[in-house]
């Protein structure tokens, strides 16, 4: 019985030591509030009138493109020093619709990532 206990203790110790030498893959996740990322097109059923060219924010295509550019620069820089491949998962808030997210990930700063 003692030999059996010693054997399993040795086997378990070797297994732990071998497992410690395995290579690890690092992934990064982030959450970012995009702060009212709206395009200039009205979506039926949504209260997005402030973000139209004649709305209270005078939201234009130029402003929209500038915001996309700036946000894509920031998001692509997150965790770049830790993980060269970039973020594995990005959670976002305050986005108008799927089309706006597609525009964001199509920006040159984010085009090389697999979104």
What are these model-predicted stretches?
Residues 19-114:
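N-terminal, active-site-proximal structural segment of metallo-dependent hydrolase catalytic domains
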Residues 1-22:
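Bacterial Sec-dependent N-terminal signal peptides
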